[in-house]
């Protein structure tokens, strides 16, 4: 009986570890290609407003993932239009991507954040 429980536990652990994260995490080149090719895309910078004002991707809107109203603000996004999300280094955008996916959005996340971005920056 113990052996059966051990085997079932091992299988469950393997299955849970192999589940997908629910969004695409891509490097800066792929992220640039995605936002350039898309007919419509919502680019969301999840850094603080001060960080956003220092420079952001062209066309990006700012919704601070650590803001108290983040969940309310993302409701304003169109669920029919893909979301491209980024932050400074990739940690906050991964948190935001999880929340967006759980809310029903299709999400691509910039792995490495804006510090990995080689394209145009808007101020």
Protein language model regions, located:
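Sec-dependent N-terminal signal peptides
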Residues: 4-14
């Amino acid at each position: 009986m113990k052996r059966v429980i051990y085997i079932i536990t091992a299988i469950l652990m393997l299955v849970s570890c192999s589940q997908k994260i629910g969004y695409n995490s891509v490097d800066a080149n792929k992220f640039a290609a995605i936002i350039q090719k898309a007919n419509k895309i919502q680019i969301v910078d999840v850094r603080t407003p001060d960080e956003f004002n220092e420079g952001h991707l062209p066309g990006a809107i700012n919704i601070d993932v650590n803001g108290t109203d983040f969940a309310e603000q993302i409701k304003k996004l169109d669920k029919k239009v893909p979301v491209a999300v980024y932050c400074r280094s990739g940690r906050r955008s991964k948190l935001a991507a999880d929340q967006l996916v759980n809310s029903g959005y299709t999400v691509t996340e910039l792995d490495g954040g804006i510090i990995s971005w080689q394209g145009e920056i808007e101020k």
